[in-house]
Amino acid sequence: MKSFLTKWSFSLLLLVGMASAAMSQKTISGVITDATNGEALIGANVLVKGTDTGTITDIDGSYSLQASEGDVLVISYAGYTDQMVTVGTSSTINVALEAGKLLDEIVVVGYGTQKAKEVTSAVVSVGREKFNQGPISDPVQLLQGKVSGLQVYNRGGDPNRASVIRLRGISTVGANVEPLIVIDGIIGASLQNVDPNDIEKMDVLKDGSAAAIYGSRGSSGVIIITTKKGSKKTGSINLSYNGQVGASSILNTIDIMSADEFKAAGGTNLGKSTEWMNEVTRTGLSQVHGLAADGGFGNSSFRISANVRNTEGILKTSGFDQFNARLNFNTKALNDKLTIDFATSVTTRDQNFAFQEALRYAILYNPTAPVLGTESPFPFNSTQFGGYFESLGLFDAFNPVSIINQNKNTGKRTEFNYGANLGYSLLDNLTLNLRIAQQDNTGASRQYYPTTSHFRGNATSPLRKGRAEFYNDNNKFKLYEAYATHLSEFGQSTLSLTGGYSYQQSNFISNYLNIGDFPNNDIDFINRIETSQDLQNAGFIGVNSDASPDEKIIAFFGRANLTVNDAIFVNASLRREGSTKLGEGNQWGLFPSFGVGVDINKYAKISALDVLKLRVGYGVTGSLPTQNGLSRAIRGIVNGPDGSVTTNLVRAANPDLKWEEKGETNIGLEVAAGKFNATLELYNRDIKDFILERVVDVAIFGVNRRIENAGKLNTKGVELALNYDLVKQSDVSYTTGVVLSTYKTVLDEYVLPAEVRGNLGAPGQNGTNMIRVKVGEEIGQIWGPVFDGVTDKGDVKFKDVNGDGKLVAGADKALEADADFEVLGNGIPDFELGWTNNLNIKGWNINAFFRGAFGHSLVNTWRAFYEPRLSTQTSYNFVNTTLAVPGLTTARYSSLYVEKADFFKLDNLTISRNIPLNSKAIRNLNVSLTGQNLFVLTKYTGADPEPALVYYGATDNGGVEGNTPDVLAPGIDSRNNYFSARTVTLGINFNF
């Protein structure tokens, strides 16, 4: 906390100190109207360009804000063309907006910009005035519901876990499944490295023809973020503050028996009534404070911002403290021929991960057990366990309060980025660009389990008492790019040509130390093992390190954009890319794209339409997993009991490994008529030679793991975006927008005819896999036996699907897939929707975003393990849903535990008001109240109906490590998930 306050104080002094240079400002007011009929536009955005100063018009179309002479006002309204007006000597500025010119918008694409009407691929541009409102901590949430085909999932409320982002579903299997993030031209930057309040615009490149120019790193789509820049008015400095205070509570949990119900069901009575979930959860408080200053001098401008975030999770002790700082500097020289843009940022994040396993044990731990050992109904040596009660002799039973109070699980990450872009106008129509960027990401994690920890310190073991783990890693990335752009005009046509070179270099280093068997707790979490003597005091030591050689990506690229008669648009690009991750002979790939767009209304002249545009695009992108040394053999360090150090083969080499390639065809139709606009996208994507780490024959390869080109996938999808300015009256305006998307992915080829992935795990169901992967079938097929009742002995009965009179494996054996198994559901939704509503009533703004997913199922593993009333497990609590089957006393996976998980939820509701102030100290005050996850409509009995797009596995996850997400096994609701939270946040923003 001390370092947290120090950073905040430094930021405050730095930014407030700049205020002395600020020029005097005045109140600018006026009315924004429709240029056609003169009606007032309610809720129009009026922003001072390059600053955080802004307001919206009231019921009369009037506005008022503080600005200085030379400032540029940007006026925007849904369905109208933006206007920019320079502030002069007058204090009154009235603006009439023209309707319907949507295609004049500028869109950021790879290595340049285009007018929206010239784009021939699936690209969506969202400016600051269209972002979701309210206090938002994750930048991608600004886009939620704005971009069809963009899914943002937040399974659980873990503050240390980022949102899951998907563009058009499954874009790869073993490579990077999330879109490439580009921040101010810096490729691969982290979303955690940018504060949402620093973002000016976000452009989403969805299809292959748009992303091909970025090569392999753009194979899952691209999100281009443009941050705010400074004002270019000489001598002007603008200061702004944004703050948030929030509270989070648990949204939903698992229905279990109360202590009385547990005793009535025959549970072991230990004399207490403990609400374990209340013992380990809390109301999590959060706060955000941010300051920004921007200004200009001469031909230069700057913007500097800093913010601090302190977030508590709903699980006690979980949360983080984060500090962000960013500087943007822009200048021109040599008679404005040379443009220099420089950006740098730093992020530090101190994390307390806690142990989300405590939530699971809060569900299943005996509700009559005491928290402390001194309250035990029988003699109990509580000192041995740190004063806590423990259920000894039971499998998988640990006191959840002891877990979070005795053990430590923390981490720290520091990210540093800088990038510089130099542009030089060699001729009027020829520009040269040089870009340099570097990222340095350092992380450390620490886990400590004292000798008294029954959870992992093994307090009952005489051989191994106490445990500590230390992990450090460092990732470095360098980027050097040079490209030139030439623009020529001939007659009614324009031609833009871009060509360039890209060099990317990355490396990775990590160190791991594992020690245990402490003589006492003097070797603790705080000491951090500082001396060799500390190490000698531990009974055992394990050391491991990993260092990758420099991995390089080298590319040559070119693009041509042709516009004919301002109505026909042709775009083509070609990228030749090589990667050292692959072996000789397979390092280079060729990735082309081509697109054509036609402004049909230019020729059809349909008076009712402002826009009618058809476009078709095709693009090929390559893809590679993020880890280094894909084709090389990987060896690990082995520490012998005698102190010797050797190596062993961990993963076999594959010199024949080649590029994973994705070819995608996209057809788009754009329509706009007055206050209505719609975009329809149809796409077909083929992924061939997808890369996957698999289990292989030890006799052939010397080890059981190898990375291979494993098969082909095909995805077909449809996306629709609709927006309408529904109501516009003197005292109220209402704008609504809906995005719909659907897709299905089919396995066309695979190295095996079929396999079943996604292991259910212990206790008792280690041999049970649940997700079938079969050639010719959709990805996500939940597979298993059909529940058909209960026997007199309480065993489960399965349906004889094939009618041969034979049942699947007996109750004492693991289930094995045979003719009596069926597809029980699919883990991927049939379709998803987002519905955004923006209502202005007499100066108040209400923004509501609803989201839903339909057609998907989830394996409720909570029920599969803990719902049957096992007579041998009277010391564990039972899950107690309305779907429980009376008399069932065996835990066997079947269709009984596969549930439809359709849901419709209010994701975000923000009520805000702009309060015009003429105070010299504070101006343009905005106050907001936001609720997130306010309600969820679903019949799913688990904690969270959100689609589970990946599975982290148990012990037998198709050869995938337990901490590696398995894209081929969606649809499993894991028992170790962090429960979702409902959050209410008060926000305040003002300029001074």
Q: PLM features: residue spans?
A:
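Short secondary-structure subsegments characteristic of cysteine-rich extracellular domains
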Residues: 320-332, 587-595, 925-936
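Extended, hydrophobic alpha-helical segments in both membrane/secreted and soluble proteins
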Residues: 199, 325-327, 554-560, 568-576, ...
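C-terminal substrate/ligand-recognition segments
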Residues: 830-855, 897-916
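Short, small/polar-rich motifs associated with maturation and membrane association
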Residues: 1-333, 338-347, 355, 417-418, ...
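Surface-exposed loop/interface segments of Gram-negative outer-membrane beta-barrel transport/assembly proteins
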Residues: 232-273, 314-315, 328-415, 433-554, ...
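Residues on the lipid-exposed face of transmembrane beta-strands in outer-membrane beta-barrel proteins
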Residues: 227, 258, 291-295, 325-331, ...
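Membrane-spanning beta-strand positions in outer-membrane beta-barrel proteins
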Residues: 72, 118, 151, 236-240, ...
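Transmembrane beta-strand segments that form the barrel wall of outer-membrane beta-barrel proteins
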Residues: 243, 306-312, 570-582, 616-618
